[in-house]
Amino acid sequence: MATPYKEERDIQKSYWMEHSSDLTVEAMMLDSKASDLDKEERPEVLSLIPPYEGKSVLELGAGIGRFTGELAQKAGEVIALDFIESAIQKNESVNGHYKNIKFMCADVTSPDLKIKDGSIDLIFSNWLLMYLSDKEVELMAERMIGWVKPGGYIFFRESCFHQSGDSKRKSNPTHYREPRFYTKVFQECQTRDASGNSFELSMVGCKCIGAYVKNKKNQNQICWIWQKVSVENDKDFQRFLDNVQYKSSGILRYERVFGEGYVSTGGFETTKEFVAKMDLKPGQKVLDVGCGIGGGDFYMAENFDVHVVGIDLSVNMISFALERAIGLKCSVEFEVADCTTKTYPDNSFDVIYSRDTILHIQDKPALFRTFFKWLKPGGKVLITDYCRSAETPSPEFAEYIKQRGYDLHDVQAYGQMLKDAGFDDVIAEDRTDQFVQVLRRELEKVEKEKEEFISDFSEEDYNDIVGGWSAKLERTASGEQKWGLFIADKK
C-alpha cells in the first residue's frame, strides 16, 4: 500500500511532468504573461537575496534555470537541483557553460539526498515548499538549517492563499498556505552541531514580490529570508512585539477597539482626516512606517490610486495585513522590516506616513534624516505619535515609559528634530484634546459591548483594555501624556 509520503511525491511529480512537457518560462511560471513578468520579477527576487559573491549556493527546485545562471555569475559554486530530469537537462544545456554549477536530478525530500551539514552559505528556492506536504515542509526546514553554515542564509519564495498564474490546469495539487504557516515552521526550527552548539533561524525579512503587486494587484507572492544564528543571539524586541504587545489575540483585540483594519488611535476616522492633509495624487508612492494590519494602506490605495509600501517589525501584524489584502486588488505591498535598518534608494517616495509607531524608536534624529533622504524633492512626511509634556516625568510616568521601551518627547522638541533633519514648513500640533475625545469614545464603545467583547475574547482582555484606556486618560488629564501631529515638507 502506498504511504501518504509516496502518494504526495507521485502526485507532485506527475503534475510537474505534465507542466514540464514544454520547457519554457511560461510553463515554469504557469502564466501566459510570464515573459513580461519575468523581466520585472526576476531582478527583484535577485535583489532581495543576501550577498553571495564567491559563496556556495544550493538552489532547490532549480527547474529550467531561470535563476541558476544569474546565481552562477556571482557565486563561488552553485548546486542546481530539481526532481524533473528534463528540466535539469534543459538547465544544463542553457547554463552548462558556467563551470561552477553542479547539476543534480534529485527530490529534495529524499533521504538519499546527501548534502554535508554546515557546507552551504545560501540556500535559494523559488516556488518549492508549496509542492510539499505540511510534514515535508517541517522536515525540509530541519534539513535546510542543518545544511547551511552558521551565519548563512535561507531564501524561499512561495505562492500563498491562492494561485497567481492564469494557466489552465486539469488538477492542482499545490498547497496555497497562509504565510504564517511558513513563518511558524521556520521560527520554531532549531538544530545542534557536533559540538553541542544550538542554532535557530532569525527572520531577516519577509515581503510580497512587488512585481506581482504592481502588475496583478496580488499580494500572495511572498518571500522570506532567514539567517542561521546561535540561539543566544538577541531577538528580544521583535519577540516582545509578537509575544507580548502585538501577539495575534492582542492585535484582534486592538482592532475591535480601533475598528476593522486599524490598530492605532481613532482608526478610520483619524486616518481619513490625516490622509486628506497629504494631498495624494494618482501614481504617487507612499511608505507607511509601522503599517499595522494595513487598513490605512488599503484606504489610501483604493481612494487615491497610490502605490503603498507598508512596513512593520511585527510578523503578526504583517501576517494579518497580507490576509486582509486577499481579493482587494489594490496596489499595496507589505514587508516585515525594521525602519532603522531598512534601506531604500534616495528619492524613492512621495509621502512617508507613520501613525503612533515612532515612539518605539530611540534614535529619532537618525530616522528623520533617513526619511528625508528617502523622500523625493517636494515630498511630505505625516506622523502622529505619543509625546509628553516638557516637564520632568513623574516616577509613575517614567516607569510606564521604561516598561514600554518608549522614547517620548514634547511636541515642540519633536518638531525641532524634523527641522534639524532638513525638513521645511514643519507643523507640530498638540492634538491631545482630540486624543482624549477619541479615547473616551473608544472606551465607551467597549464598555457598551462588554458582554460581546468578553464572549469573543475574555474577561481578562476586557479588563486589560478598559484599564489601559483609563490609564491613558489619567496620564493625559495629569498633563503628562500628549499626542502630536507632525507634517513637514522636503523642498
Swiss-Prot record:
Single GO biological process annotation from the record: phosphatidylcholine biosynthetic process
Gene Ontology MF: a single term: mRNA binding
N-acetylalanine found at: A2
Subcellular localization: Cytoplasm
UniProt cross-references to CDD domains, sorted A to Z: AdoMet_MTases
Record-listed E.C. numbers: 2.1.1.103
Pathway connected to this protein: Phospholipid metabolism; phosphatidylcholine biosynthesis; phosphocholine from phosphoethanolamine: step 1/1
Primary localisation category: cytoplasm
Domain of life: Eukaryota
Annotated residues for binding of N-methylethanolamine phosphate: Q245, Y246, Y254, Y386, Y400, R404, G405, Y406, K472
Gene name of the record: NMT2
Family: Belongs to the class I-like SAM-binding methyltransferase superfamily. PEAMT family.
Chain sites annotated for binding S-adenosyl-L-homocysteine: G61, R66, D82, D107, V108, N126, V263, S264, G290, D312, D338, C339, R355, T357
Organism: Arabidopsis thaliana
Triggers of expression: Induced by phosphate starvation.
Tissue expression as described in the entry: Highly expressed in roots.
Effect of loss of the gene: No visible phenotype under normal growth conditions. The triple mutant nmt1, nmt2 and nmt3 is seedling lethal.
Residues annotated for phosphocholine binding in this entry: S159, S164, G165, R169, Y176, Y254, Y386, Y400, R404, Y406, K472
Alphabetical keyword list: Acetylation, Cytoplasm, Lipid biosynthesis, Lipid metabolism, Methyltransferase, Phospholipid biosynthesis, Phospholipid metabolism, Repeat, S-adenosyl-L-methionine, Transferase
SUPFAM superfamilies: S-adenosyl-L-methionine-dependent methyltransferases
Protein name: Phosphoethanolamine N-methyltransferase 2
